[in-house]
Regions:
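Conserved N-terminal/central alpha/beta ligand/cofactor-binding core
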Residues: 1, 42-136, 140-141
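Gly/Ala-rich phosphate-binding loop of Rossmann-like dinucleotide-binding domains
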Residues: 23, 27
Length: 169
């Protein structure tokens, strides 16, 4: 993998909303972050989705489940906010608004971003990670965890690259 550092504060596996928001918050806090995504970026992913729908050909690494933004990117755009393990839902909503969602999601009882808005939102989330000094690397599947003693030290990719971090998300 070009431009990969040997060690990061955090290695994030997957660029779904959870991984993207975690990486964005860490990068903006000045931490070194590397996001490893097995699928393609949101624009390139569209061609793989078209192949599924038109030709019935599925790329196992870039489809409705895998790729920038994860499974939520091509969902109906509804946000599930009723979890019993709430966390900081308001802060997450604010991050989504900062990256293109409408302000209404901050107070709607049933927040909805909209399918047509999600691809642009996830691309803007990636751009915010990169602008803050983080890296997002596509078409890179994590295949193994690197464990020394009882500590997780990093990951190995399908290309045999080793990516280490103090934390792995």
């Amino acid at each position: 993998i070009d431009n990969i550092q040997p060690h990061y504060t955090a290695v994030v596996i997957g660029s779904g909303y959870g991984g993207g928001i975690a990486a964005s918050r860490l990068a903006r806090a000045g931490q070194s972050v590397c996001v490893l995504e097995r699928g393609k970026d949101v624009q390139a992913r569209r061609y793989d989705l078209a192949a599924i729908n038109k030709e019935h050909v599925v790329n196992p690494d870039s489809n409705y489940c895998f790729g920038e933004g994860g499974a939520g990117t091509y969902s109906d755009g509804k946000l599930y906010t009723r979890s019993k393990k709430r966390g900081d839902v308001q802060r997450i909503m604010e991050i989504l608004v900062a990256h293109g969602a409408k302000d209404e999601i901050l107070f709607d009882a049933h927040p909805h971003i909209g399918t047509n808005k999600l691809p642009k939102l996830v691309a803007e989330l990636r751009e915010s990670i990169e602008q803050a000094g983080g890296q997002v690397i596509f078409q890179t599947r994590v295949t193994d965890f690197l464990i020394e003693g009882s500590k997780l030290k990093g990951v190995r990719t399908q290309q045999s690259d080793v990516v280490e971090g103090r934390a792995t998300i």
